[in-house]
Swiss-Prot record:
Its cofactor is Mg(2+). One of its GO terms (biological process) is phenylalanyl-tRNA aminoacylation. Belongs to the phenylalanyl-tRNA synthetase beta subunit family. Type 1 subfamily. Residues 403-481 form the B5 domain. One of its GO terms (cellular component) is phenylalanine-tRNA ligase complex. Tetramer of two alpha and two beta subunits. Mg(2+) binds at residues 457, 463, 466-467. This is Phenylalanine--tRNA ligase beta subunit. It comes from Chlamydia caviae (strain ATCC VR-813 / DSM 19441 / 03DC25 / GPIC). Binds 2 magnesium ions per tetramer. Residues 39-154 form the tRNA-binding domain. One of its GO terms (molecular function) is magnesium ion binding. The gene is pheT.
Length: 793
């Protein structure tokens, strides 16, 4: 949203420096950028009044004008169509430097045009660098009638503009009034309404229409005004709209736009001859129907979409845009002016079905002030009557009523608890009151807070805490220890910190997937309807589709490799209800590392993804004896390169090489290795034990290697864990050295070589002690290996 500083200052009881305004916006959470337009010379371009004009003797399209700057007269040859006696315009004197439409500089000089001397040049706003104030092509800029003569034209036109980036929760700031109101909360000025918006109430008639949908539109107002026309707006109104980045159209439309940009209430104008005011109302479309809009675009309005209609036909998309057939045009002399409050959810749904965006829709989707509907309509009517003194205004027809303001219970001690410092209830109460919140009652430090009608973002108690915190410049030193994070939050932080610091890139993908991306997962996903999107309709039950799509995008853009992870929410459906699970996904593809003079090309493998899981478990102090890797079968993975992880008899996740057909479907030429773990399961199975660091051993260790013949279906890791389960006091570790399997298809056995490391913490073991312990462990292991099948009992 772009606002001019001069327009914004009119809403303050006293002017504020631009620096203080920017600091206030930053304090309340509004990002701003400042632009100052001052592009021309101060002294050489002045204000002057056209006294008279006569036709040029040698040119049909030129006139010879006499201008007066308050002290002397000038003869100027001018070709602007609006050059006429009585107007005050910018006059560029000899020596003034201007720029043409291509940005090239030129200097004004005395010259003769078709034989007549010209002592300068009459200027348009665009020629002075103020293109936003230019309302007509090749026209002169017209100052108000009370503009002093001989003053610097550039000084009068120069202004500072503030570009505000509003977050969705700050819809109440999408107007000069709303922005000024927020700024006054953190400054020492009061909010005031400019005179044109302070109006006496007009006559209203409350009506009932059978088709009016109160849930869609709680209050709907319209008024008939006759004796108007599509004449051009006064220069003052055109300048005001130009400062708000709005193009002037005609007087009636300009008034409605000015009210919307100033007060935040969208208005719409109909041709009274095309609309029946007595049956005009808001409802949902009963069937699909075509509609041609003001922008000449023909759309199909689906059944259930919010519309405005009378007894005969549809005249507009509610809260978005009117129809072309019912619009105000050059021949209109009688209008119907509409002001209403639509529920934000209804207009958001309409924009989903009919994606037409407008300034009105921008405000309605974020929520406007329902209590401002009638005051804004009063202001528009008074402005129209000012421009058209003979206009006749009928009583305002009101359908419905203003919705009641909501009330929240608020514990004052919650602010101190969140801030981590003591805070008196009176401080909280006074701060809320200064922000426009009325306290209806107070009991035991619990306030009953009435929410202002324009604050649609205040829904819960914590929102009130945020209001107090964001607008109050607290400067109290907090010596209290920070609050303890939830176990899941702490676990996620540890996982993210480790993986990111270890070299993986963190990805963020959307929880909702389009059908094409969701198809990358070979499991069936549950589809849901979402009003915010036509494409993203599948709620993910795995991180795989999003990560796979992101990997394909990066590899197709010539990234040498993708080593990435994501921590996010997945959704499973149990008993017709969705259950949220916090999951970790790791994906590897491409090269193992970037090729350089010191490194060679090394391919990734199944063991690369397995190594990341093991390093993560080691970082999280998950003992290697606590988890088991078991065979697994899933359509997403390569049939012989996948495994499932069990931790304390709970399924923790799965990992492996993705199926080549799946990679081909994702348009990835490289092998892809993927792991997905449930952080919920990991959190629930982790033991809260004190992890102690051990010093390096001072006594030497010894190792013995053994080779066992077992059935090919026996996991090698099960032999390692079986040896560790015997609880030998000297057995320090067991590791797998090699696995050999004969290529002969008739052979169903394999050889597994293990290394056993023996060590005592208090002395050096003798060879005899090591041999005896080694033989004992080997005998115990052989006793559990089935001699006929080679399996472990």
């Amino acid at each position: 949203m772009r606002v001019s500083l001069s327009s914004l200052q009119r809403f303050f009881s006293s002017p504020l420096p631009i620096k203080q305004i920017i600091e206030a916006c930053d304090h309340i959470g509004i990002e701003t950028e400042v632009e100052t337009l001052l592009t021309c010379s101060f002294s050489s371009i002045i204000t002057a009044k056209v006294l008279k004009t006569v036709p040029h003797p040698n040119a049909d399209k030129l006139v010879v004008a006499t201008l007066f700057d308050g002290q002397q007269e000038y003869q100027i040859v001018c070709g602007a169509p609006n050059c006429r006696p009585g107007i005050i315009i910018p006059l560029a004197l000899p020596g003034a430097k201007l720029h043409d439409h291509e940005g090239n500089a030129y200097t004004i000089k005395k010259s003769k045009l078709r034989g007549v001397e010209s002592q300068g040049m009459c200027c348009g706003a665009d020629e002075l660098g103020f293109a936003h104030l230019q309302t007509t092509e090749r026209g002169l800029f017209e100052f108000p009638e009370n503009t002093p003569l001989g003053e610097s034209a550039c000084a009068l036109l120069a202004d500072t503009f503030i570009e505000c980036s509003l977050t969705p929760n700050l819809g109440h700031c999408a107007s000069l009034l709303g922005l000024a109101r927020e700024i006054t909360y953190v400054t020492n000025v009061d909010l005031v309404l400019p005179p044109e918006f302070v109006c006496t109430p007009l006559e209203t008639i409350t009506k009932e229409t059978s088709g009016q949908d109160q849930h869609l539109c709680p209050i709907f107002c319209c008024v008939k005004i006759s004796g108007v026309s599509a004449q051009a707006s006064p220069q003052e109104l055109q300048n005001a709209l130009g400062g708000l980045k709005q193009k002037s159209i005609n007087s009636i439309v300009d008034i409605t736009n000015y009210i919307m940009l100033s007060l935040g209430q969208p208005l719409h104008v109909y041709d009274a001859n095309a609309v029946d005011i007595d049956s005009l109302h808001a409802q949902k479309a009963q069937k699909d129907e075509p509609l041609k809009l003001l922008n000449n675009e023909e759309v199909l309005v689906p059944q259930g979409t919010a519309i405005i209609c009378d007894k005969d036909h549809t005249v507009g998309l509610a809260g978005v845009m009117g129809s072309l057939d019912s619009s105000f045009n050059d021949a209109t002399t009688e209008i119907i002016l509409e002001a209403a409050y639509f529920l934000p959810s209804a207009i958001r749904a309409s924009q989903t079905h009919v994606p037409i965006h407008s300034e009105a829709a921008y405000r309605f989707t974020r929520g406007i002030d329902p209590n401002n509907v009638l005051p804004a309509l009063y202001a528009a009517i008074h402005y129209i009557q000012k421009l058209f003194p003979n206009a006749k205004v009928s009583p305002i027809q009101v359908l419905g009523s203003t919705p009641q303001a909501s009330t929240l219970s608020f514990r004052t001690e919650l602010v101190g608890k969140i801030l981590g410092m003591p805070l008196h209830a009176s401080q909280v109460r006074d701060q809320l009151h200064s922000l426009g919140f009325n306290i209806s009652s107070e009991e035991n430090s619990i306030l009953s807070v009435n929410i202002p009608s324009y604050r649609h973002d205040i829904q819960e108690e914590i929102d009130l805490v945020e209001e107090v915190c964001r607008t109050q410049p607290w400067k109290v030193e907090n010596k209290k220890a920070p609050a303890i994070y939830s176990p899941m939050y702490s676990l996620k932080r540890r996982v993210v910190d480790f993986l990111a610091n270890s070299g993986l890139q963190q990805f963020f993908t959307c929880d909702l997937l389009d059908t094409e991306t969701a198809a990358l997962n070979r499991e069936e996903a549950d589809c849901i309807s979402l009003q915010g999107s036509k494409q993203a309709t599948v709620l993910r039950d795995s991180l795989l589709p999003g990560l796979l799509k992101s990997t394909a995008t990066n590899l197709n853009r010539q990234a040498p490799y993708v080593h990435a992870f994501e921590v996010g929410t997945t959704y499973t459906k149990k008993s017709s209800k969705y259950q949220e699970t916090q999951s970790l996904g790791i994906i590897l593809s491409g090269q193992a590392e970037e090729i350089s003079w010191i490194s060679h090309e090394r391919p990734l493998s199944f063991y690369s993804i397995k190594g990341w899981i093991e390093r993560l478990f080691q970082y999280l102090h998950v003992s290697s004896q606590a988890y088991a890797i078991q065979p697994y079968e899933h359509a997403n993975f390569h049939p012989y390169q996948q495994a499932e992880i069990h931790l304390h008899k709970h399924v923790l996740g799965r990992f492996g090489t993705l199926h080549p057909q799946l990679c081909k479907k994702a348009q990835i030429k490289h092998s892809v290795f993927f792991a997905e773990l449930s952080l919920d399961s990991l959190l629930h199975t982790q033991k809260k034990a004190l992890h102690l660091y051990k010093p390096y051993p001072i006594y030497p260790s010894s190792f013995r290697d053994i080779t066992l013949t077992v059935h090919e279906s026996v996991p090698a890791d099960s032999l390692r864990k079986k040896l560790l389960s015997f609880h030998s006091k000297w057995l320090e570790s067991v590791s797998i050295i090699s696995i050999y399997q004969n290529k002969n298809p008739t052979t169903q056995n394999k050889n597994v070589s293990l290394r056993l490391v023996f060590q005592d913490k208090e002395r050096t073991l003798s060879n005899q002690e090591i041999e005896e312990e080694h033989e004992r462990l080997l005998a115990m292991l052989n006793a559990q290996i089935n001699d006929t099948k080679g399996t472990i009992d």
